[in-house]
Structure formats: structure tokens, C-alpha cells
């Protein structure tokens, strides 16, 4: 057997392994099994059997060669395996690196895309922000251009066009006319109007403590004849700069002191020095003057002037409020660096309530103010002044009040227009006279603040040796401390003089006059105990006296019925008993008058101190009327009855003079429609017409913070219901709502003014008065009631004051009725011409309170913009919010016929179906004729509100309470209040004119009523049968109702023989069903 040679020494036949070519190497699997390459270790089925014969015989012949051959093959196989393994590892590494590079590239690409997207988004935001800034800038420019155009139009107005701002020529002509008319009277009577008694200089005048060493320097001297009043040229020297006997050195010294005082305020400008100096002249005392209504006005006419009304009974609010006002103004300045461009809050959908009112004219110059003040003096001659009053100019004691330096002109104009009543003899010399006239509208509680300053301490000032206060808070405490000490000392001296004078008069000849025991301090409980002496005539409580014999003289200025009754009462008195009775009555009146004056001053002083955050507690002395050491008790027993625990079951009235102190610090009420003269005029009207005497006057109180939080949020209650010291503890972001008004005062918007000291107390007092009256009516102590309160409340929302309102009085009263008395059904009727958005918000989801509002809506274009007919409530309160929204503007304006139709077709049917337990009325009278378009514009009569009140009295068993809301024309609100109170008393109302009875409602009103009825017919079935009579007049509607009632009665009288009488009545149609 031959074998061929091989390079490896092996025969080609016996070589079991062949070398791998590169192509096969590349296609080899990644894993190799070594066992397959070893013939000795492979299973027999894995390798084919070798059947060759030569091979079998060669194995035993060449064992060594075979072994060597196997070793070589195994070695070669191991080498190939290592090579393949290295190739596979290299391939794996190459692919892994390739995949890693791809992943990294993808990751970089993704990051790049994200960065590009972020860059694009940021660029878009920048562009959007730039567009907003540009748009805001354009809006500001347009608004500025618009204001400039309006101002330019006012400046370039033609003389023939109407304007609310009087031109200079008109003012000069009016002033010249008044001066010429009053020149002779002023020249003839000026010297008689000035008191020359030096005691009045120190006891009744106000001057700075810097001038304590010198007599008061008045603008005019009492010992010289004065020149005739006339016009002064602006180029001339100021006529009242100094008197002839005053040296220039003393004048310069006084001017330096006054400038130093004024410059202590950060708000005062250096340029307003002459104006402020002109206002610091000494007051002129007038001892024999009185005020009454304007000439030609009867007892129903209100005060024709809305002058500055701030206080009464000799306690001026400007003295304690000066440091507090300065504190607030200082915070306004230091927070942002300047007071001006602070944003004004606007209502939810419309601007402020007074938007569109004519602008007030510029303040007159100092010379004009001097002329107006001197013109008022002759008109006060030969008149009776109320006890404890005299005339004094308005003194600006705070920087904010100095900005409105012309604020005292309305006071003097108010005094010039007063009518001169018949002169009466004073009851007691030195005490003033008791007004016994019956035709006066302005009572003792209506006199302006500048008149109530007779026996009052001097305004507080800083002595030359006193150090300057370091901050506003230190100044406030210093002023209050000085005021407290001076007031008590002054009051003690005054009371001792009065008691000594009275003891000399009424003491018996056989008994020497005893020194009276003075009690200048009194506890709060005793003040409350004596309130009965202040609210009702003392003569009504005298035992053993007939009422007709005492109707002629009343201490609290209650109007007498007539002069004939007085004369008749005098004739009925027996001649023998007349001297003793009159003398005893005179003594009692004198003692009571002294007690009333003292209690008035203490109450007002204590209230002003508490409003400023300084509690004042008096010693627990007994009331002087019950002390045996009193001179009055030496002659006759002085019995003071406690106020009755249960009032008369009649109409209740509530009113408090502290609400008069809520007024703007500018002092100009002409620029603020909601002023103190509103409620003062109403109260005087009720007193003069005799309605007040027929009602039960209850005592009001301040609502607690917990009561206010039943409707308002805690932050809102603390911000607007606490004193300045507590407000300083709040977050500065909350107090930023206060802004500086154009008039110089402070407010939360251009309508809603804010007084740092008195506004919170007045707002809480208004709520408390309404709550007290509502609870007395709900519990059956009173029949019904009328609350003469301010500020109003139906616009105040949970956390937002607006529209003159801070706290919602009616809403708080309704919430407390639900919580404390568990009243299940309460009806709130709001007939103010503006929608009560605050009351609607408070009860929008409450099914137990039905809120019905009659207001001017004009498709949301009238303040406040809310009150659409489709606002029916939410949740369980759906259907219990009824908005009788009148649309169509003032073409024509709504009147009596439209409101009577709305009551007939919407209000009364729903109210009867609701069947309330108590009825509350937000009684705003700004829908009465006489209000300008922005404040109302409707033409309702005052009689109409009397008829609306009479209809509501048929609900809830007569438990009806009216709370004053809006209304800014004094004549309109006085007439409407008189009509409502007369209706509450059950008096017969004056009939409506025939024109109103036969007048049909206008098309706009019919459309508005049909829309409301269509919306609410799904909630109130009573509206379905009245849709056909919406357009009828009152006479036509009554005729239809009469015919329907006759038809129902006739059908009820029909009989069917087969049916028993008992079943016939059940199948007859009801009155609510339409007639067959």
C-alpha cells in the first residue's frame, strides 16, 4: 500500500482535518464545541465508521506515529480554536463600539433638539412679554390721551354749553350779588354779633397752646368798628393779616411757631402756608343765635345744604382724630415713597357708583373764604342758639384736613340760609335758650360740628418746653393723654359753675346755698341708665301731670302740636296752682338740662376715645340726679325712672349720632354723596312731623367681630372693624387697600371714603343698630321698624368693600336670625336702584332666604353690573334669588306704574307663596325722582314707597324691618322715609294720583317683567296665571282680579244634585287656577 507524501508528514488519505479558508472562518458560529473535534471523545453516532481494510491493519503497525499524529492534530485544533475565539472577541468589540457610537450620537442629537425647543419656547415667552408690555404701554398712552382730550374739551368748552363746573365769571357774579345784597346788613350788625366778654375768649375759643401767654388773636377785634365788607383784589395785601395794634416782631414770632407746627407733618407742602394760616384765626362767639329751616320751607323740607356734619354736643371729632389720621397718611407715604398713583378698586364689572358725576369746582381762595365767613355772621343775629353751641370756623387739625382747606364754606352757607325764628326768653340765665318753635328742620342733633364748641377745651398743641415726639404713635399717646386730662379738668370746673348757679336760683331764701357735690365722672352703666333721659321727653314721665298741660315745653326739642294747643293748655291750668306748678316744672327742667348736657359730653368723649383705641373708664360715682348732695334734691325729690324693660308694641326707630362721624377727612361733603347729612335730615324730618314721638326709639350698639364674621371674612372684619392700633398688627399687604383720594382724603375707592378713627366704629354701629331692631321685631317686642343708619351695606361682599359699604347690615341680621332664633324663612327685599351684589352673594345657595331685588340693570351697564334675571341661585338655593332687573335705560325712566306692576306680578306673588317668617328690606331711596343719572335716574315718587311698604306689611304677620341703604338727594330721602314710617305706623296714606293709577307700564318694563316671569315660572307656579296682566295698569289689574274673583264665586255657588255638598267644594276650581 503506497501513500503519498504530505507537507505535514501525513498521507492525504489519513488526514481527518482540513484547513479553514478565510471565507469559512467568517461564517463560523460564535461558539465552538471542542468535543466534536476529538475523535476519542465523540459519541459513535457522531462520526461515521471507517470500513477501510488498510486502515485496520495499519493501526497496530504504527502506534507511535498515530499517537504523534493525534497530538499534532489536537495542537492544531487548539490553535485554530484560539484564533477563532480572538476573531469573535474582536468582532464583538467592534460591534459594541459601533453601537456605542451610534447611541452617543443619538443622545447628542436628542439633547440638541431639546435645547433648541427650550430656546424657542423661551424666545416665544420673551416675545409675548414684550407684546404685553407694548400693549400695556399703548393702553396707558391711550388713556392718557383720552384724559388730556377730556381736560382739553373742558378747557375749550363754549360758553353756551352746559357744564357742572361753574366758570370764574359766574362765581364772581354770584359773589358780587351776595356781597351787594348783604353789605348794609353786615355793616350795621357785625359789631353786635361779636362777644366782647373776655370770659368767652378763654372758655369757648380754640387756640394753640403756644399762645397760652397771650390773649387770643381773632381775625377781627371786638373793640373797633370794622370796614364794610367788599371785594379784595388778589394783588392787595391780605386784609386780615394782623391788627393795627399788633407789632411786627410778635407777628413774625407767631408765624414761625405756626410754620414749625405745620412742618411736623410729612404730608404738608410748604406752599399751603397762607391758606392754613388763614384758617387758624380765632373763632367768633355768638350767644343769641339759632338755626331753622330755609325760608319758605315747611316741616317737610330737608336742609338745603349738605354741609360738613361731624358731631354734636360739643365734642369735635377732629381733635382726637388728628394723630390717627396723620399716622395713616404717614404709612401711605412711607410705603411707596409717594401717595399718588395708587390703583383704585373698581366694582366686579363696572366702575364706581359715582362715575359720571359733575366735577366739583376748585376750592376758593383764602380771601373768598374770609368773605364767606364774615357774610354768615350778620345772618345769625337776634336768633336763639341751642344750649352749648356757638359758631366757630372749621379748623383743620390734621394734614389731610388741611389739604381741603375750603371745607368750612358749606357750613357758613348753611348758616346764612337759616330762617330767623321768633325770639324766646331763656329759661335760665347763662344756659342758653330752649327752642320752642315748631317749624324747624334742623334740631339740636342736626347742628353742624362748628356750632357745638361752646364750653370745650382748647385744641391740643405742644408747649415750647415739650420735646418733639419721635414717631406718630408717640404723638398720638401724648395728644390723647393731654386731651383726657384737660377734658376732665374743664368738665369739672364747668359742672361746678353750673351747679352753683342753679343752686342760687332754686334755693329757698331761708336756706343758705350749699356747695354742690360734683361728680364729673360716670360709669358706663350709669350712662346707659340715663339714656332714657336723652331719647324721650322728660315731661312724659312726670307723675301727676296732665299731658296737654305740658305739651308746650319740651327739653329735647320735640315739636309741639300747634300754638293753639299750647294756648289751650295754658288756659286749662287752674289759676291757683299755676305759679307753683310752673315754678316746680321750671326747676325740674333746669336740673334735667344740666344733667343731659353733662351726660352728652361724657358719652361722646368716651365714644371718641374708644374709637381711637384708648379705653376710658370713669369712677363709679352715683348719678348726680340721685345724690342727696345735689342742689336739685334740696328743693324737690329728683326721681329718675329706669328705662322700661319692654318697649311699646309699635314701630321701632334706631339712630345714633356716632354714625355722623364717618366722613372724609377733606371735610367737603359736596364731593361725597354719602355724607352725614343724609341720616341727620331724615331724623329731623321724623321729629318735626311728629312720627318720631309715635315710635319707640331703641338704643343701638356696635356689632361684635363674631357677628360680622357670619357674613364677612376674618381679615375683612379685622381690617375694617377694628381701631388703628389693631390694624397696625395686620399684614402690610392687607392695609395696602387704602389709597389717597383726589379730594385729599383716604378711601378704598373713589366712592368709599375711610376715616381712620370713626369709620370702623360707625360701620359696626350701623350693623349693630339693624341687628337690635330686627331681633326686637322678630321676638315680638316691636311691631315693625325703620333703621336710620349709615354707612349702607348691601354692596359689601365677603371680603370687598365697595359702593359706600363696608359691612352688610341686612345680611348679618338675617344670618343671626337663622343662628340664634332658628328662623326658617326670611325674605329680603332690596328696592335700592343699585343691585345688592353683597346680599346676593351671601345667600346665593341658601333655600331658607329668598332675596328679591328691584334695580336698574340695563344689560349690565349700570353699577355694579350684577343682578341679571338669569342669576337664580345655585345648589339648593336655585329659584330663591329673584332679580327684577329693569332694562332699557332712561327712555323712558321707570316710575310708579312700573314698580307697582312689578310688585303686583312678581314680588308679592312669589313672597306669598314663600310665606316668610320675617321680612327685611334694604330700603334705598335713590330710585326717587331727583337723583342724577349716575346715581339713579328713575322717577319714582315718595308716596309709592309708602304703598310698597304697606303691601309688605301683609307678610310674616307684619314683622317687617326697613334698613336705610342708598339715596343721596335730601328732599327725596326725607319724603320717602316719612312715607315708609307713616305706613309702618298704620296711618292712612295719601292717595296716588289718578294718572299713576291709569298709567300702564312702559314697554321696557313689560319686557323685563316678562323675562323674569319666564325664567322663574319653573320655580314659582303663581307666576303662570299672571303673565297676561303684566301690561295692565293698576286699575285694569284690580278690575281683572275682581272679575276673576266673581267668576270663582259664581262657580263655587253652582250645585249638582247627584253630588253631595261636601264633595262639591273639593272639586270646585281654586282661586289660583285660571277661570273657566
UniProtKB/Swiss-Prot annotation:
<feature type="region of interest" description="Histone deacetylase">
    <location>
        <begin position="652"/>
        <end position="1076"/>
    </location>
</feature>
<dbReference type="GO" id="GO:0141221">
    <property type="term" value="F:histone deacetylase activity, hydrolytic mechanism"/>
</dbReference>
<feature type="compositionally biased region" description="Polar residues">
    <location>
        <begin position="205"/>
        <end position="224"/>
    </location>
</feature>
<keyword id="KW-0479">Metal-binding</keyword>
<dbReference type="GO" id="GO:0030018">
    <property type="term" value="C:Z disc"/>
</dbReference>
<dbReference type="InterPro" id="IPR023696">
    <property type="entry name" value="Ureohydrolase_dom_sf"/>
</dbReference>
<feature type="modified residue" description="Phosphoserine">
    <location>
        <position position="630"/>
    </location>
</feature>
<feature type="short sequence motif" description="Nuclear export signal">
    <location>
        <begin position="1043"/>
        <end position="1076"/>
    </location>
</feature>
<comment type="function">
    <text>Responsible for the deacetylation of lysine residues on the N-terminal part of the core histones (H2A, H2B, H3 and H4). Histone deacetylation gives a tag for epigenetic repression and plays an important role in transcriptional regulation, cell cycle progression and developmental events. Histone deacetylases act via the formation of large multiprotein complexes. Involved in muscle maturation via its interaction with the myocyte enhancer factors such as MEF2A, MEF2C and MEF2D. Deacetylates HSPA1A and HSPA1A at 'Lys-77' leading to their preferential binding to co-chaperone STUB1.</text>
</comment>
<dbReference type="GO" id="GO:0045893">
    <property type="term" value="P:positive regulation of DNA-templated transcription"/>
</dbReference>
<dbReference type="GO" id="GO:0045944">
    <property type="term" value="P:positive regulation of transcription by RNA polymerase II"/>
</dbReference>
<dbReference type="GO" id="GO:0014894">
    <property type="term" value="P:response to denervation involved in regulation of muscle adaptation"/>
</dbReference>
<dbReference type="GO" id="GO:0048742">
    <property type="term" value="P:regulation of skeletal muscle fiber development"/>
</dbReference>
<feature type="region of interest" description="Disordered">
    <location>
        <begin position="239"/>
        <end position="323"/>
    </location>
</feature>
<dbReference type="GO" id="GO:0001649">
    <property type="term" value="P:osteoblast differentiation"/>
</dbReference>
<feature type="modified residue" description="Phosphoserine">
    <location>
        <position position="209"/>
    </location>
</feature>
<keyword id="KW-0597">Phosphoprotein</keyword>
<feature type="binding site">
    <location>
        <position position="743"/>
    </location>
    <ligand>
        <name>Zn(2+)</name>
    </ligand>
</feature>
<dbReference type="Pfam" id="PF00850">
    <property type="entry name" value="Hist_deacetyl"/>
</dbReference>
<feature type="modified residue" description="Phosphoserine; by CaMK4">
    <location>
        <position position="629"/>
    </location>
</feature>
<feature type="region of interest" description="Disordered">
    <location>
        <begin position="622"/>
        <end position="645"/>
    </location>
</feature>
<dbReference type="GO" id="GO:0031672">
    <property type="term" value="C:A band"/>
</dbReference>
<dbReference type="GO" id="GO:0006325">
    <property type="term" value="P:chromatin organization"/>
</dbReference>
<dbReference type="InterPro" id="IPR024643">
    <property type="entry name" value="Hist_deacetylase_Gln_rich_N"/>
</dbReference>
<feature type="region of interest" description="Disordered">
    <location>
        <begin position="541"/>
        <end position="580"/>
    </location>
</feature>
<dbReference type="InterPro" id="IPR000286">
    <property type="entry name" value="His_deacetylse"/>
</dbReference>
<keyword id="KW-0804">Transcription</keyword>
<dbReference type="GO" id="GO:0042641">
    <property type="term" value="C:actomyosin"/>
</dbReference>
<keyword id="KW-0175">Coiled coil</keyword>
<dbReference type="GO" id="GO:0005634">
    <property type="term" value="C:nucleus"/>
</dbReference>
<dbReference type="GO" id="GO:0003682">
    <property type="term" value="F:chromatin binding"/>
</dbReference>
<dbReference type="GO" id="GO:0046872">
    <property type="term" value="F:metal ion binding"/>
</dbReference>
<dbReference type="GO" id="GO:0045820">
    <property type="term" value="P:negative regulation of glycolytic process"/>
</dbReference>
<feature type="coiled-coil region">
    <location>
        <begin position="66"/>
        <end position="169"/>
    </location>
</feature>
<keyword id="KW-0832">Ubl conjugation</keyword>
<dbReference type="GO" id="GO:0001501">
    <property type="term" value="P:skeletal system development"/>
</dbReference>
<dbReference type="GO" id="GO:0033558">
    <property type="term" value="F:protein lysine deacetylase activity"/>
</dbReference>
<feature type="region of interest" description="Interaction with MEF2A">
    <location>
        <begin position="117"/>
        <end position="312"/>
    </location>
</feature>
<feature type="short sequence motif" description="PxLPxI/L motif; mediates interaction with ANKRA2 and 14-3-3 proteins">
    <location>
        <begin position="348"/>
        <end position="353"/>
    </location>
</feature>
<keyword id="KW-0156">Chromatin regulator</keyword>
<dbReference type="GO" id="GO:1902809">
    <property type="term" value="P:regulation of skeletal muscle fiber differentiation"/>
</dbReference>
<dbReference type="GO" id="GO:0031594">
    <property type="term" value="C:neuromuscular junction"/>
</dbReference>
